[in-house]
């Protein structure tokens, strides 16, 4: 297993082992976030990151991800192959070091990789530690090498198993069911969303996802490939919105040795949608690259608008927010040594990145505005309208602030509050309609459960201007009941959760089409105006039963058609089925037993796996554009629960 060790060559000596991995199995959440669905998918991303690092270094352009029938998963690339030579310090093959030492990998060696997504993660060794079985196969220097592992430990030494013309690495793993006790079943859409994102962020590479599960496995799979990168990404994200200008404004370059890519487009909506990435990592909490983008955008557009004289008649100052209304933008930077901060370590802290992005955006926009004066005028007109709407919205928002319980106003009259004042213990149910609200009030545990009835369908915030949102009585009641305010020391628009009164906010609607629509309206509001509640894990959806199956003295609830059929078969002839179309059809005891009792109920926690994809879906379902919505409904009709 000898390897030539010249500078800039990826070899056994490029691999640096930082620490042991005994810890991983005992404290998996420290390494992958959690051991639920999100943590399970994080395993895949860690392995794919290795292949993406090879692509960033210019050595790989094809990656294949296969969900196997036995719930294992395979990642294959056509890179150089992980080095297999003997590691000087460790005395074993470099492949074994990479696979069994936490933090080991070429990503810590600057001669092998200039930038790396893997730096943020914990490497393929953590995946190995959390897998009941793993196999690594390496195609390198005309030979095939392989090694297998059980729960992070090598079963045998790295062995040569033949000759090959290929290069690359294949890793297959099966998550350990003693650690991932909830599920080891991969979600196709979750993986597809991330792989699509990676294809857009790394134009030119091909990423294929194959699912071999089920009766009709698709061996061809789905191919993600982008020639235009962020330009295509932004068109995909904004496909369901009406464009304000035809062009995507984009740039790709380097400032102070920091590669910067930006794409942006204006639409007719009232929402700001900024997506930022560092070394392919989605930085949900933003950071210096995003603040640099905002500064460059605001200063350049303000300078142009002032010079044009279009702002002369405005009676109030324009703010940075006004320049970003109706803007969808993606900022992607590559940083050699990223420093991550924030609650979830997804906020970039490198100060030098801010000026690099700000300068890049300023130059890009100056050129565009100069060459496209008609589009420039349309953008500035939109900014002026946004400023006027913000001025109106501020007054409405101040009304919301004044009405919050903590600032002297009273709680909404319809709120039936709970006795406890410990937010960690308290939960509030948002219930459609007064009749269902009455049943819920009777059925609840008054010590820790509050009920807020909502009158019919709340406002569709996707189509409404901001001041209309804050003027809406139902929405104002939600703000007041929850005790949240708008504005923190860092951000005047951010949600202030310091005085949040409930740590479980449960949407409880009828199990019919109308109920689903109301749930979606409420979720759209939370996503657009109270996203921090979702990101902090406070939003849940109740799951009331669809059926009650009875025979004689026996009765059982069913939450799906399949469950209903099983119960009918079990009960035999003479069983009767009651279909619950509304919460009001259940009495207080039934509602408590099935939907509100913490010991028996099922709550679905609302999370955001992929912000860009969530944004796209909400725009498509709740926005103005009808054709994409119709196409989605036709494609998904077979999964729908339709009442006729």
What is the meaning of each model-derived region?
Residues 388-407, 422-427, 438, 442-444, ...:
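C-terminal interaction appendages of subunits in large macromolecular complexes
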Residues 1-14, 21, 45, 53-55, ...:
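GHKL-family ATPase ATP-binding module
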Residues 26-45:
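Conserved short strand/loop->alpha-helix "switch" segment adjacent to the catalytic nucleotide/phosphoryl-transfer site
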Residues 87-88, 95:
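Short adenine-binding "F-helix/F-box" segment of the Bergerat
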Residues 81-86:
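A short glycine-centered beta->alpha linker in the GHKL/HATPase_c
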Residues 21, 28-29, 95, 587:
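Conserved activation segment
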């Amino acid at each position: 297993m000898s390897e030539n060790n010249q500078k800039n060559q990826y070899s056994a000596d490029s691999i640096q082992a930082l620490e042991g991995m005994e810890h991983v199995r005992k404290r998996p959440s420290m390494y992958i976030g959690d051991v639920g669905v999100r943590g399970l998918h994080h395993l895949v991303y860690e392995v794919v990151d290795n292949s993406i690092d090879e692509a960033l270094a210019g050595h790989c352009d094809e990656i294949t991800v296969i969900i196997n029938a036995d719930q294992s998963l395979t990642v294959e690339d056509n890179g150089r192959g992980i080095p297999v030579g003997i590691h000087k310090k460790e005395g074993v093959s470099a492949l074994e070091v990479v696979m069994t030492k936490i933090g080991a990998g070429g990503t810590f060696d600057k001669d092998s990789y200039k930038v790396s997504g893997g730096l943020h993660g914990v490497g393929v060794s953590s995946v190995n530690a959390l897998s009941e079985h793993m196999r690594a196969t390496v195609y390198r220097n005309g030979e095939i090498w392989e090694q297998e592992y059980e729960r992070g430990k090598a079963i045998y030494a790295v062995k040569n198993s033949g000759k090959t013309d290929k290069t690359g690495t294949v890793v297959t793993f099966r998550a350990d069911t003693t650690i991932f006790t909830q599920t080891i079943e991969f979600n196709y859409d979750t993986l597809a969303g991330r792989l699509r994102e990676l294809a857009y962020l790394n134009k030119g590479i091909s990423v294929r996802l194959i699912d071999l599960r089920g009766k009709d496995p698709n061996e061809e799979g789905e191919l993600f490939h982008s020639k235009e990168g962020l330009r295509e990404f932004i068109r995909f994200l904004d496909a369901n919105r009406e464009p304000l200008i035809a062009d995507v404004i984009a740039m790709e370059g380097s400032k102070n040795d920091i590669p910067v890519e930006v794409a942006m487009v204006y639409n007719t909506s009232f929402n700001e949608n900024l997506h930022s990435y560092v070394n392919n990592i989605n930085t949900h909490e933003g950071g210096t690259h995003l603040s640099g983008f905002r500064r460059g955008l605001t200063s350049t557009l303000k300078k142009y608008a002032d010079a044009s004289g279009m702002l002369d008649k405005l009676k109030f100052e324009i703010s940075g927010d006004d320049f970003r209304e109706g803007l969808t933008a993606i900022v992607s930077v590559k940083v050699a040594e990223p420093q991550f901060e924030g609650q979830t370590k997804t906020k970039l802290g490198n100060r030098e990145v801010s000026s690099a992005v700000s300068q890049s955006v300023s130059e890009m926009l100056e050129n565009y505005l100069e060459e496209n004066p008609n589009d420039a005028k349309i953008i500035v007109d939109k900014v002026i309208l946004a400023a006027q709407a913000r001025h109106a919205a501020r007054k409405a928002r101040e009304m919301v602030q004044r009405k919050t319980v903590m600032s002297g106003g009273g709680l909404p009259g319809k709120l039936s509050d709970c006795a406890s004042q410990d937010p960690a213990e308290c939960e509030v149910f948002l219930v459609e309609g007064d009749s269902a609200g009455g049943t819920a009030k009777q059925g609840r545990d008054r010590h820790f459960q509050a009920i807020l009835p909502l009158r019919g369908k709340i406002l569709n915030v996707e189509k409404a201007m901001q001041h209309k949102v804050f003027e809406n009585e139902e929405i104002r009641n939600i703000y007041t009941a929850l005790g949240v305010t708008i504005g923190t020391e860092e951000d005047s628009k951010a949600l202030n959760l310091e005085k949040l009164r409930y740590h479980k906010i449960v949407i409880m609607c009828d199990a019919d089409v109308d109920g689903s629509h109301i749930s979606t309206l409420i979720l759209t509001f939370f996503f657009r105006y109270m996203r921090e509640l979702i990101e902090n894990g406070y939003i849940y959806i109740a799951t009331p039963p669809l059926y009650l199956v009875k025979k004689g003295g026996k009765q059982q609830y069913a939450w799906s058609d399949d469950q209903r059929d099983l119960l009918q078969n079990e009960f035999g002839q003479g069983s009767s089925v009651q279909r619950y179309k509304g919460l009001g059809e259940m009495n207080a005891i039934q509602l408590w037993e099935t939907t509100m009792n913490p010991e028996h109920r099922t709550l679905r926690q609302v999370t955001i796996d992929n912000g860009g994809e969530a944004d796209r879906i909400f725009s498509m379902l709740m926005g103005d554009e009808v054709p994409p919505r119709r196409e989605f409904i036709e494609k998904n009709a077979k999964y729908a629960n339709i009442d006729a």
